[in-house]
Amino acid sequence: MLSEIDHQILHVLGRRLLGRDKGAPRIAVVGNCQSFGIAYGMKLLIPQAHIDRFTIVRKGVTTLDRLAKTLGRYDHVFSLEFQPGFVRGGGWEELKALLPDVAPIPSIVFSGFHPDTIYILDPTRGGYPVEGPTGPYHSAIALYAFLRGMSVEQTIALFGEPLFEALGYFDVWQDSAREFLDLAAASDLDLSAELVRWSRSGPFMYSMNHPKAHVLFDVAKALLTRAGLNTAPVEFSDFAVDDIVRGVVFPVYPEIAERYGHRGSYLFKRSNYRLSRNIGQFDDLAAYIAGSFAVYAKHQRAQLMVPRMIDWDANPEVGRLFAFHAADALTRRYAAAQV
């Protein structure tokens, strides 16, 4: 079955045969779900450019040699890192060996707004991701509560400032910022000023690795500047297209957002890539937890024991924290209901 990058290479080759390549400079953007925002931002900044996006999100039949030959016809090639297996013959490192001038794009990863988010990579299935209501993104609190046999109501009671504080969720920001800036620096970009601006404007991530569109636009501008290309003055909000938001949105919890002067929510958005057919689905906290529990109930405990669960399970204090905060919150709710 052909993947997105297979189709794109066939499209580009067909267009070249017909002599329909127009625009300069010729720019190629290679990468995952973040690549559309980068490519779109570059087109806004250099409207006369010819820009193609080569999406690498699924395994295809294209060989690395064919990809490199296709990309070799462009004036500038920008690429996010990708692992071997998506393209036959290698990954990012092998592509660099064939195309030494390929410019790296930093992967936008930031956990400061989403310290509770984890992946569940099933160790019994070679690390295959367990999908829940929000795709591969899961709540560590919800998963641990399930593993301890808590009810949905008890789990809802856990979500609040006391447990977040005890788990260190308010202490993640600085490490996340440093890791993000280190990734950018590895691509010869200084995005420190951009990070400050994004942080002041509000939560700038839909999940820990899905940035909002204006973030990718700013990264696109930084990449073009690094490449020595002149960009046009443009207000992104006048032309904003956000491809990533069609996927899941893992909310920034209110208690976490408020720490940084913003407003959060417990509204979980499910993915919907067919907007012409339906509007989509959102879950409140209760529905999200119930949906997650229904998924976890179909798996063996060993399939759900990701590193954070192993660490928490090995620490008796974490179990006591969960039991205490669930009971305390439920007691306070009951007392308030009697008033």
List the predicted regions and their residue ranges.
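Extracellular glycan-modifying ectodomains
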Residues: M1-V339
